[in-house]
Amino acid sequence: ATRQELEATIESVELAMQEDNTANRNTTLGGYGELHYNNLDKGSAIDFHRYVLFLNHQFADNLNFYSELEVEHSIAGEGKVGEVELEQAFVQWDYSQSHNFKFGLFLIPLGILNETHEPDTFYGVERNTVEKNIIPATWWEGGFGFNGELAPGWGYDLAFHSGLNLDADNASASKRSNIRSA
């Protein structure tokens, strides 16, 4: 009887593991880190520039959750240059093979670098000055949006979001610093 009980226990554990693995395949965890060494005239420095975690979940074939949490410059707090940011957290519904709808916190579809801003998409260690100080790279807002492909090479990206902080009294209304976080 002991051998039969042992085999039954092993079989039930194997079944439980198979069920657990099936459920876990719907959730993915990923990320990347970026460590910089800069040797400049004013001194050299090492900076863990960013550490990014992705957590995604597929509820159904056409319904997904995407999120991105980022820690910049290793340290955050009063008097420190670091930041902890929730850059993305949105649900996307693929209502057809070529079109989808999303809502939540997402990257605004503007420019070349905003939605594809990972370190391997620009040349060098740092982003160039225009993309770093003028164009809002990594600009996210809360809202909803549609995107898709009408024909090969003809796509669209339309978003309704919380917008820019362009106060008329703001002397620097054209600067990147006026982008507010949702």
Q: Positions of the model-derived regions?
A:
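N-terminal periplasmic/intermembrane-space "pro-region" immediately following the signal or transit peptide
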Residues: 1-37
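Surface-exposed strand-loop-strand hairpins of Gram-negative outer-membrane beta-barrel proteins
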Residues: 22-28, 36-50, 173-177
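Outer-membrane beta-barrel strand-turn architecture
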Residues: 23, 59-61, 95-97, 150-152
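Transmembrane beta-strands of outer-membrane beta-barrel proteins
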Residues: 27-33, 65-67, 101-103, 156-158
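Residues on the lipid-exposed face of transmembrane beta-strands in outer-membrane beta-barrel proteins
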Residues: 31, 53-57, 89-93, 103, ...
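Transmembrane beta-strands of outer-membrane beta-barrel pores
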Residues: 35-41, 50-52, 71-75, 107-109, ...
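Surface-exposed extracellular loop regions of Gram-negative outer-membrane beta-barrel proteins
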Residues: 46-76
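Surface-exposed coil loops of outer-membrane beta-barrel proteins
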Residues: 76-80, 97-182
